[in-house]
C-alpha cells in the first residue's frame, strides 16, 4: 500500500529564518517549504523572510533560494508554482550583535499574521536573538520560536540557554525540534507499535535479541569543520537524532497521542538508561582517500581528538528491556548513506529442521533514508526440490 500525504491547510503566516543563507536553510528548510507550497499547504499570503549577515537584497536572496531548490529539489523546480513561491520570499540583512537591520525586520513582519522565528544559527546567538525580538517588539505573545540542535553543549549550558529564552518567551512558545521526527517512517513507527496487536506483545526482551539504530553518512564535514570539531558525532547525532529514535522504539505506550504524553514516556526511557562504560564505546576519525581530505585535514586541526564516527552499546534497565542491548552508530565518510532501525528477534528456541537448516532470525527493518520503507524478514522454505532448505526473505510493508 502506498503512503498517502494528506494536506492540512494552515493560516497565513510570516516565517522568519535566522541563518537564511546557511547550510540548514538551503538543504532542508527552504526545500521543505517549497514542497509544502507545491502540495497546497502553504497559502499564497504566507511569507518567508530570510535573515542573515550577508549583504544581499530580496532579489539576490530569491536567486539564492532558486539555486538551492535546483540543487536539492530538482524534480520540483520546473513546476509552475516556483514563480509564485519566490514572490513570497523576502530578505533582511541584520547583525545579531548590534542594532543594524532590526528596524527593517520589524517593518516586514506583519502584526496580524501568525509569526514563527526559526533560529537556524549557532546556539550562542539564541539569547541575543530572543532579546532583540523583544527589544524591537517584533515578537508577540502568540509568536513561536523554533530551535534546532545543538541545544547547549552540556546540561549546565542547556539550562542556562533555557533560562535566557524564558525571559522573553513562555514554554508553549518554544519549539525545540528534531527534524528526524518528521520523517514518514519515524512517525509510522508509532503506528506500527501501538496500532497493531501483532508487534506489541513481542516488543520486549523475551522475544527481541537486540536493536540496531544506524545513521551512516557518505559525506565528510563538508564546510562545517569549525562547528563539527567542537561537537563531534556524539553531540551532533547521538544525543539528539539517535536518542529520539531510541526513545520511540523503547518507550511504553503513552496514555494518549499528545505531545506531553509522548514526552513523558520518552523521559522514562532516558531515566532507565544504564551509565555507558568506555568498553562499550568505539570512536574514530575518517582518513584520507585518494584526493579526498582526511578528517584532520578537513577541520584544519592536526591534533583534533573529535570523533567523526561513534558506536555504542546501550542498556535499558526496566522490565521490558533488561538484557536486550541497543546498538547506536553514526559516522561520516562511510561506505554508503543509510539510516535505518533493525529490530532483530531471537531465534526459535528449538529448530525441528536440524543443523543443516542454519541460523535464522526475524527482523523488522525500518529504512529512514535514502529510500523510506519498512520490511519484515521472514524465514521460509526455499522453493524447489532438495529437502527443507530455509531462506530469509524480506516482506515489504511500505
Language model regions located:
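Secretory/organelle targeting and membrane-embedding segments
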Residues: 1-146, 151-398
Amino acid at each position: 500500500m502506498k503512503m498517502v500525504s494528506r494536506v492540512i491547510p494552515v493560516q497565513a503566516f510570516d516565517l522568519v529564518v535566522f541563518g537564511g543563507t546557511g547550510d540548514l536553510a538551503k538543504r532542508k528548510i527552504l526545500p521543505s517549504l517549497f514542497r509544502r507550497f507545491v502540495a497546497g499547504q502553504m497559502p499564497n499570503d504566507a511569507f518567508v523572510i530570510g535573515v542573515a549577515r550577508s549583504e544581499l537584497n530580496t532579489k539576490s536572496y530569491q536567486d539564492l533560494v532558486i539555486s538551492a531548490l535546483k540543487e536539492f529539489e530538482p524534480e520540483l523546480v520546473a513546476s509552475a508554482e516556483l514563480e509564485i513561491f519566490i514572490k513570497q520570499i523576502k530578505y533582511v540583512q541584520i547583525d545579531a550583535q548590534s542594532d543594524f537591520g532590526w528596524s527593517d525586520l520589524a517593518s516586514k513582519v506583519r502584526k496580524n499574521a501568525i509569526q514563527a522565528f526559526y533560529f537556524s544559527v549557532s546556539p550562542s546567538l539564541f539569547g541575543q536573538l530572543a532579546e532583540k525580538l523583544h527589544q524591537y517588539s517584533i515578537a508577540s505573545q502568540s509568536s513561536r520560536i523554533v530551535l534546532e540542535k545543538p541545544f547547549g553543549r552540556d546540561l549546565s549550558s542547556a539550562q542556562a540557554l533555557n533560562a535566557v529564552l524564558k525571559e522573553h518567551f513562555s514554554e508553549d512558545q518554544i519549539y525545540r525540534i528534531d527534524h528526524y521526527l518528521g520523517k514518514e517512517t519515524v512517525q509510522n513507527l508509532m503506528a506500527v507499535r501501538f496500532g497493531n496487536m501483532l508487534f506489541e506483545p513481542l516488543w520486549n526482551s523475551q522475544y527481541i535479541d537486540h536493536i540496531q539504530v544506524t545513521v551512516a553518512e557518505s559525506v565528510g564535514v563538508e564546510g562545517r569543520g569549525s562547528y563539527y570539531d567542537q561537537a563531534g558525532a556524539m553531540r551532533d547525532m547521538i544525543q539528539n537524532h539517535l536518542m529520539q529514535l531510541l526513545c520511540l522504539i523503547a518507550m511504553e505506550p503513552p496514555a494518549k497521542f499528545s505531545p506531553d504524553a509522548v514526552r513523558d514516556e520518552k523521559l522514562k526511557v532516558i531515566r532507565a538508561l544504564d551509565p555507558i562504560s568506555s568498553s562499550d564505546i568505539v570512536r574514530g576519525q575518517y582518513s584520507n582517500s585518494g584526493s579526498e581530505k582526511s578528517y584532520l585535514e578537513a577541520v584544519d586541526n592536526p591534533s583534533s581528538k573529535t570523533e567523526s564516527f561513534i558506536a555504542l552499546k546501550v542498556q535499558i534497565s526496566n522490565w521490558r528491556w533488561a538484557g536486550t542491548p541497543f546498538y547506536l552508530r553514526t559516522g561520516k565518510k562511510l561506505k554508503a548513506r543509510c539510516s535505518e532501525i533493525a529490530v532483530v528477534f531471537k531465534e526459535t528456541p528449538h529448530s525441528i529442521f536440524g543443523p543443516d537448516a542454519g541460523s535464522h532470525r526475524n527482523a523488522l527493518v525500518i529504512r529512514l533514508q535514502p529510500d523510506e520503507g519498512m520490511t519484515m524478514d521472514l524465514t521460509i522454505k526455499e522453493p524447489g526440490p532438495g529437502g527443507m532448505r530455509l531462506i530469509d526473505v524480506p516482506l515489504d510493508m511500505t
